[in-house]
């Protein structure tokens, strides 16, 4: 695996380009030297960990995946999985930085995962733990932030000055970009839209509350409703029951989407219900944030217009002041399930640049000290006394 000494020596004088300068939690456009080396992005979701090598243009050079360790396992088990994936990729690629998109609340310094509803992380110092084991710079961010960054840089959000990303997977993630900056909030946890309570006293959420938005418009919500109908042996569920051989536990989101495309009435209606709740939430976010564009991503978005069509309809019905205000565009994400991984890799490239500049400053400082030491040694003790 490459170290940062290798990186510094190999990439002095790399091509200049427009990059984003990281200051605290803000990214600003800056025409500075940026390393255009491949970096590794890792997207950690509730069911899978996806890792890939991504170049500076957002092109995936290679990707691999593993199952997400069970929530009951220790936080270190997830860390071990990440390290194994990075080491596997480093056998075939130079790894100069690693970006992590984590399904949880990440602090403002992007170093600790404060809480992850679907994982065992509780105030987990993930960045430092991984950095010490991988010997390269590591960046940690919320997975929706990394997905939004990727869509703004390379996908459906290009050219938008105010974008809101909504990711529908195991739960619901969210992110806000304005003027080329990810808005993380004072404590780093802005965009946790999935835990807005939309049904007081409703379904229990892994976060500990009831009635969260993600309990009504997510992959988990979709599968829960289908399994409940199948377990009750509802006549509308006979088709999906037959497809899984009567094993209700085998019902998955992709299967529901597949059957909906084939015209299965129950699956079509389930996706419509999920879409309706999605549209209601988007209308609420439009009232609060007034973006120019909503980008819908995550695994559930693979249902395309079976989901997004009902969402657009519900959005228009519930939008405050409709007819008297501009309406935000609702677009499906273009980068698919790899968006979080691509965005994490791209954001880690900014961290790599900062490390590179810091390394250069340290080298220059040491060289100055060495020159002073050589000069003092050449002067001799008598000359130094005279000075």
Q: What is the role of each PLM region?
A:
Residues 381-386:
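Short, intrinsically disordered C-terminal tails of secreted or membrane-associated proteins
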Residues 64-66, 117, 186:
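Short hydrophobic alpha-helix segments
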Residues 117-123, 139-145, 165-168, 331-338:
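Active-site nucleophile and cofactor-binding loops and adjacent substrate-binding regions
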Residues 176-192:
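Short, charged low-complexity linear segments at domain edges
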Residues 2-13, 17-97, 107-112, 127-138, ...:
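ATP-binding/phosphotransfer module of carbohydrate and carboxylate kinases, centering on a glycine-rich
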Residues 43, 99-103, 141, 165-171, ...:
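Short beta-strand segments
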Residues 147-153, 174-176, 195-196:
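Adenylate-forming
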Residues 68-70, 121, 189-192:
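A short acidic/small-residue loop/turn micro-motif
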């Amino acid at each position: 695996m490459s170290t940062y000494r290798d990186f510094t020596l190999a990439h002095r004088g790399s091509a200049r380009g427009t990059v984003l300068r990281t200051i605290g939690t803000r990214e600003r456009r800056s025409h500075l030297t940026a390393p255009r080396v491949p970096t590794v992005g890792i997207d950690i979701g509730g069911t899978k960990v996806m890792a890939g090598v991504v170049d500076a243009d957002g092109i995936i050079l290679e990707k691999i995946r593993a199952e997400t360790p069970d929530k009951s396992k220790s936080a270190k088990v997830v860390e071990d999985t990440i390290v194994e994936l990075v080491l596997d990729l480093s056998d075939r690629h130079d790894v100069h930085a690693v970006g992590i998109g984590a399904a949880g609340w990440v602090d403002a310094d992007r170093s600790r995962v404060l809480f992850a509803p679907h994982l065992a992380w509780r105030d987990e110092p993930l960045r430092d733990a991984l950095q010490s084991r991988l010997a390269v710079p590591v960046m940690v961010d919320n997975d929706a932030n990394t997905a939004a960054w990727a869509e703004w840089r390379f996908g459906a959000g290009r050219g938008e000055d105010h974008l809101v990303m909504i990711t529908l997977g195991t739960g619901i993630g969210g992110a806000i970009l304005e003027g080329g900056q990810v808005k993380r909030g004072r404590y780093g946890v802005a965009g946790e839209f999935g835990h807005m309570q939309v049904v007081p006293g409703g379904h229990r959420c892994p976060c500990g509350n009831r009635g969260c938005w993600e309990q009504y418009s997510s992959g988990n919500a979709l599968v829960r409703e289908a399994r409940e109908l199948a377990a009750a042996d509802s006549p509308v569920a006979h088709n999906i029951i037959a497809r899984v051989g009567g094993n209700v536990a085998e019902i998955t989101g992709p299967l529901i989407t597949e059957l909906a495309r084939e015209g299965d009435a129950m699956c079509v209606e389930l996706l419509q219900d999920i879409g309706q709740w999605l549209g209601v939430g988007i209308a609420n976010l439009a009232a609060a944030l007034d973006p120019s564009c909503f980008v819908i991503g995550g695994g559930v978005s693979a249902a395309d217009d079976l989901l997004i069509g009902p969402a657009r309809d519900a959005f228009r019905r519930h939008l405050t002041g409709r007819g008297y205000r501009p309406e935000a565009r609702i677009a499906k994400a273009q980068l698919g399930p790899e968006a979080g991984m691509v965005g994490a890799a791209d954001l880690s490239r900014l961290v790599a640049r900062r490390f590179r500049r810091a390394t250069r400053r340290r080298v220059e400082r040491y060289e100055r000290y060495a020159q002073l030491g050589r000069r003092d040694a050449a002067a001799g003790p008598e000359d130094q006394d005279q000075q």
